[in-house]
Amino acid sequence: MEKSQKVTVLGGGSFGTALANIAAGNGYPTVLWMRDQERAAEMSKTGENARYLPGVKLNEKLICTSDMQEAVANSDLVLVSVPSKSFGDVVRDAKQYAKPGQFWLSTTKGIDEKGFKLMSDILREELTEQEIGVISGPNLAKEIGQESLAATVVASNSEPVRTLVQDVLSCRYFRVYANVDMYGVELGGALKNIYAIIAGLASALELGENTKAMLITRSLAEMSRFAVFMGANPMTFLGLAGVGDLVVTCSSPLSRNYRVGFALGKGEKLEDTVAALGEVAEGVNTTRLVRDKSRELGVEMPLVEGLYKIIYEHFPIKEVVSQLMQREQNSDVEFVLPRSEAN
């Protein structure tokens, strides 16, 4: 049965396509917007996003378009699913067609370098008459497209936003959990990209399972430490948007950031690796932004510092690993034993 609320997804990448397909499959009139008119026409004709989500059949009722007015003007729920570097531009292009009372959510896991803004900050600045939120979690788009069992988190201060997103996106293979800590959910999605690169490096160097476990756990500690300084709830990082997203992106070759790290560990050039991906690996830019912000705040983030040295200062990987292993040993769980009291 067709539902009354209309859904729009801005961004024809892999994750945006997967979410739009779910919404259409749940009976919501859904429009998937992308800049490229030819690609929109091709997807409408073939019923497939051959570039970003090949092999996944699109719902026959899903409308693909490059017309922003058609996509936004009559929508009730707008999901923005574009890379962070173009997020602000897309929202500013779209807001002229926005109407009061619409729900706008970001699915983008990145940080805007202009003032260290998260995507919800941009939505809040640009859309003053709309309710906002974010979606984040352990969501590899290819697996979702193939209908593998998965879950995500919708975070918003608005209960109607959370409820509608759960209704629109929940299905037999995809669950949607709710949270009010929008900042924490969003930070988790952005920060884990850094550590996925590190995990890929470790895998390429064949450092072992103990090493991987250590890296993931210390990554979670580092993320939580930074999040507290930024005003997020550390408990959020124990959920799907924190440890859940961290584990999947640090373990799967389907993760773009993991693949970047793996290639670096094999001695490939960063520029060649990023170009070969065909999609954005947010962790490369996020590493620089978080390293600078952590220094500004006085937050210790040794893994971020180490990766920054490898990517931007071209330190030998083995030298950075050696430096990290020789650091002063501190507390394991800092919210139990503060760093200042550790041996």
From Swiss-Prot:
SUPFAM superfamilies registered for this protein in UniProt: 6-phosphogluconate dehydrogenase C-terminal domain-like, NAD(P)-binding Rossmann-fold domains
Entry's localization field: Cytoplasm
Name of this chain's protein: Glycerol-3-phosphate dehydrogenase [NAD(P)+]
Sequence intervals crossing the membrane: none
Alphabetized Gene3D superfamilies for the sequence: N-(1-d-carboxylethyl)-l-norvaline Dehydrogenase, domain 2, NAD(P)-binding Rossmann-like Domain
Residues of the active site: 192 (proton acceptor)
Domain of life: Bacteria
Gene: gpsA
